[in-house]
Design a protein with these regions (language model features):
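Short coil-to-helix segment of the ABC ATPase nucleotide-binding domain corresponding to the Q-loop/switch region
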Residues: 101-109
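Hydrophobic anchor residue at the start of the ABC signature
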Residues: 155
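Conserved signature/switch motifs of ABC ATPase nucleotide-binding domains
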Residues: 140-143, 161
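Conserved ABC transporter NBD signature motif
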Residues: 72-84
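Catalytic Walker B motif of ABC-type/P-loop ATPase nucleotide-binding domains
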Residues: 166-169
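Helix-to-loop junction immediately C-terminal to a conserved catalytic motif
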Residues: 64
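Conserved ABC ATPase "signature" region
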Residues: 108, 112, 119-136, 189
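The feature captures the beta-strand-to-loop junction immediately N-terminal to the Walker
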Residues: 49-51
Length: 278
């Protein structure tokens, strides 16, 4: 039996934020993540889903090294994560492209600290723009691009540093439904062509099933793994409207909804915020 390589290992991660209570209120501690553990295997897409406030984005930023965890370990290719690094690419919800740079120059941005020549940077950026379907848009500036095109540039920029794992924080949530489905298909195509490992945060149940090999459902704050669901559909997959009619798709979606609905019940005692008495 073939052993799958663990690309990302999250083990016992916890995070608490201190919240300022205001002029007449005490500060308090907010437990966001509690002993959260899971693995992501090489070449797979894993989605994180759960109700708002369960810590999905916080976890992604901890993995990226933008926020310190309070407890637990994170490893990428067996190397501990101690801060930001080139082994992790981050795709934000908003493209946040530099408005004074062309699409190609935005993609080149992450390469400028790697000692590559101008020609090498330009060639790699052009290849990535072609990969995301924008081969002829390299000289256009962000204000000349649609929202969907800007997100393609955002993805190409994250891929430019050739990360071991791609972290995607609701990258399609601000797009209209049609553009969203187009980019979901594009993500699967790009994943197939690059064999990248992806950790994908979304609120959309259908999107989570469609793009993923597995879906991790997080419980309400403090976030922890409630259940990990396998998505058995092989790649390449039919378009999402067609897949929605599959009974297996419907069963997975129903189970995800049940788990999230359970999390919306009154909070567990350990999820209640704690007064800091500072």
């Amino acid at each position: 039996m073939e052993t799958r390589k663990v690309k990302l290992a999250v083990d016992g991660v916890s995070k608490t934020f201190r919240v300022r209570g205001g002029k007449y209120q005490e500060d308090y501690l907010l437990n966001v993540l509690r002993r959260l553990s899971f693995d992501v295997y090489e070449g797979e897409v894993v989605s994180l889903i759960g109700e708002s406030g369960c810590g999905k984005t916080t976890l992604l930023r901890i993995i990226q090294g933008l926020i310190r965890r309070d407890a637990g370990t994170i490893r990428v290719d067996e190397r501990p994560v101690t801060g930001p690094g080139r082994d992790r690419g981050y795709v934000f919800q908003q493209a946040n492209l530099l408005p004074w740079r062309s699409a190609r120059a935005n993609v080149e941005f992450g390469l400028e600290l790697q000692g590559l020549s101008s020609r090498e940077r330009g060639d790699r950026a052009q290849r990535l723009l072609e990969l995301v379907g924008l081969g002829k848009a390299g000289e256009q500036f962000p204000h000349q691009l649609s929202g969907g095109m800007q997100q393609r540039v955002n993805l190409a920029r994250a891929l430019a540093i050739d990360p071991a794992i791609l972290l995607m924080d609701e990258p399609f949530s601000a797009l209209d439904a049609q553009t969203r489905e187009v980019l979901q298909r594009e993500l699967l195509r790009i994943k197939s062509e690059t064999a990248k490992t992806v950790l994908f945060v979304t609120h959309d149940l259908d999107e989570a099933i469609y793009v993923s090999n597995r879906v991790i459902v997080l419980g309400a704050r403090p976030g922890r793994v409630k259940e990990i669901l396998d998505v058995p559909f092989s790649f390449p997959r039919p378009d999402l409207p067609e897949l929605r009619g599959d009974p297996t798709f419907q069963n997975i979606r129903r189970r995800m909804w049940e788990l999230i609905r359970e999390s919306s019940a009154p909070a567990r005692p350990e999820a209640v915020v704690e007064r800091a008495h500072l």
